[in-house]
UniProtKB/Swiss-Prot annotation:
Keywords: Membrane, Transmembrane, Transmembrane helix. It is found in: Membrane. PROSITE patterns: PROKAR_LIPOPROTEIN. The keyword Transmembrane helix applies. It is a single-pass membrane protein. This is Uncharacterized protein YidX. One of its GO terms (cellular component) is membrane.
């Protein structure tokens, strides 16, 4: 019996490469790995560092979550949280983002719908009643609210932007992007199709202090 050592060593040499490549299949840029099925997967994430009023080049106004990698113009759903954070009767140091924010991308990866879950740790009955007024469901120790109707568009960072007008967060928080995939496979990540428009930032005039992930400071 004649052994094919040449073929054996060739296969052995390819084995480590196969192992290395298998580790790269996480999250984004994996195609055709889910043929015959559909679902939702995490494509990537970003860290939100600040908030500002803004409008894009089309005149669409809203609030912008300023990220380390991208900017996110919130066109719907942010008014309630801004009003709440501007209320001096609420102790903003007791506001906490319960989990990472979740943004689900649309098919074109230019728009998203988002969810942010908040905790508010009340100190007295007056704070508890006020939190209830803002839509929180209150228990013995804290109140909870899920902001499920955030809508917006994703924008590239503008190198000429004056980011001094951004109100920086005490504690930046993470947002995770999710995409739906079909039997055709998992699509590219969010960076493949961003809106080529400029977001113009402006100062939030009210004395807004947005504290998230309060537990980090414990």
């Amino acid at each position: 019996m004649k052994l094919n050592f040449k073929g054996f060593f060739k296969a052995a040499g390819l084995f480590p490469l196969a192992l290395m490549l298998s580790g790269c299949i996480s999250y984004a840029l994996v195609s055709h790995t889910a043929k015959g099925s559909s679902g939702k997967y995490q494509s990537q994430s970003d860290t939100i560092t600040g908030l500002s009023q803004a409008k894009d080049s089309n005149g669409t106004k809203g609030y912008v979550f300023v990220g380390e990698s991208l900017d996110y113009l919130i066109t719907d759903g942010a008014d309630d949280i801004v009003k709440m954070l501007n209320d001096p009767a609420l102790n903003r140091h007791n506001i906490q983002v319960a989990d990472d924010a979740r943004f689900v991308l649309n098919a074109g990866k230019k728009k998203f719908t988002g969810t942010i879950s908040l905790y508010y740790y009340w100190n007295n009955e007056e704070e508890k009643a006020l939190a209830t007024h803002y839509g929180f469901a209150c228990g013995v120790q804290h109140c909870t609210r899920s902001l499920e109707n955030l809508k917006g568009t994703i924008h590239e960072k503008n190198k000429n932007m004056d980011y001094s007008k951004v109100m920086a967060f005490y504690h930046p928080f993470k947002v995770r992007f999710y995409e739906y995939y079909s039997p055709r496979g998992i699509p590219d990540g969010v960076s493949a199709a961003l809106l080529p428009v400029t977001v113009t930032l402006d100062i939030i005039t009210a004395p807004l202090q947005f504290l998230v992930v309060y537990a980090v400071n414990q």
